[in-house]
């Protein structure tokens, strides 16, 4: 599959002791191939019962192309948790902590009882996913499904243990000696 092929051949960079992979789905560079985006969206659609979904939720930034594509295919609207405050009525701020940053995310556009699908590009530490889940719970949404395209590290396990929600992923990987390894 194209996702796995492009991951195996993507560049990596080392910052300190951590090796990052640079890929169109996770970084938007060097270029996002529409065939890759279609493949990922189609694979997510096969994993989720969209009949029971009112809204798709992601955090900015790299979840945005994913939820846009999914929305176009399924006619389900999407909501983006933003990194800046808009001060809209009912806006829910939530703390986000990842392996490389700390900050706030802000949720708008979710109403009590909304049945939601959470989609994100990568789950590694689990910090972003925990923030999304916490915000949706505060809003009174019903989390029906969670899909992350790429799994790396222990984040999936951490989120599942802390929240009780199961997370589906399309591919699990690690970076070893400057190369992406599909697990």
From Swiss-Prot:
Gene Ontology biological process terms from the UniProt entry: IMP salvage; purine ribonucleoside salvage
GO cellular component: cytoplasm
Record-linked Pfam families: Pribosyltran (PF00156)
EC number from the UniProt entry: 2.4.2.8
InterPro entries: HGPRTase-like (IPR026597), PRibTrfase_dom (IPR000836), PRTase-like (IPR029057), Pur/Pyrimidine_PRTase (IPR050118)
Keyword annotations: Cytoplasm, Glycosyltransferase, Purine salvage, Transferase
Chief location of this protein within or outside the cell: cytoplasm
Keyword Endoplasmic reticulum: no
Locations listed in the record: Cytoplasm
Domain of life: Archaea
GO molecular function: guanine phosphoribosyltransferase activity; hypoxanthine phosphoribosyltransferase activity
Pathway: Purine metabolism; IMP biosynthesis via salvage pathway; IMP from hypoxanthine: step 1/1
Top enzyme class: transferase
Reaction catalysis annotation: IMP + diphosphate = hypoxanthine + 5-phospho-alpha-D-ribose 1-diphosphate; GMP + diphosphate = guanine + 5-phospho-alpha-D-ribose 1-diphosphate
NCBIfam families with a match to the protein in the record: HPT_Archaea, PRK02304.1-4
Biological function: Catalyzes a salvage reaction resulting in the formation of IMP that is energically less costly than de novo synthesis.
Subunit structure: Homodimer.
Family: Belongs to the purine/pyrimidine phosphoribosyltransferase family. Archaeal HPRT subfamily.
Protein name: Hypoxanthine/guanine phosphoribosyltransferase
Species the sequence originates in: Methanotorris igneus (strain DSM 5666 / JCM 11834 / Kol 5)
Lineage: Archaea, Methanobacteriati, Methanobacteriota, Methanomada group, Methanococci
């Amino acid at each position: 599959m194209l996702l796995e092929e492009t991951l195996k051949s993507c560049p990596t960079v080392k910052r300190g002791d951590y090796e990052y992979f640079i890929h169109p789905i996770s970084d938007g560079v060097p270029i996002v191939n529409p065939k890759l985006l279609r493949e990922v969206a189609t694979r997510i659609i096969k994993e989720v019962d969209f009949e029971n979904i009112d809204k798709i939720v992601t955090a900015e930034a790299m979840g945005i192309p994913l939820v846009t594509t999914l929305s176009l295919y399924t006619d389900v609207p999407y909501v983006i948790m933003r990194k800046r405050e808009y001060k809209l009525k009912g806006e829910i701020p939530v703390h986000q902590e990842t392996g490389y940053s700390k900050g706030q995310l802000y949720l708008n556009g979710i109403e009590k009882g909304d049945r939601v699908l959470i989609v994100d590009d990568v789950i590694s530490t689990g910090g972003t996913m925990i923030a999304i889940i916490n915000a949706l719970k505060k809003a009174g949404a019903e989390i029906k499904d969670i899909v992350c395209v790429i799994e790396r590290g222990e984040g999936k396990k951490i989120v599942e243990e802390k929240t009780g929600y199961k997370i589906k992923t399309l591919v699990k990987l690690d970076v070893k000696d400057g190369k992406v390894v599909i697990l």
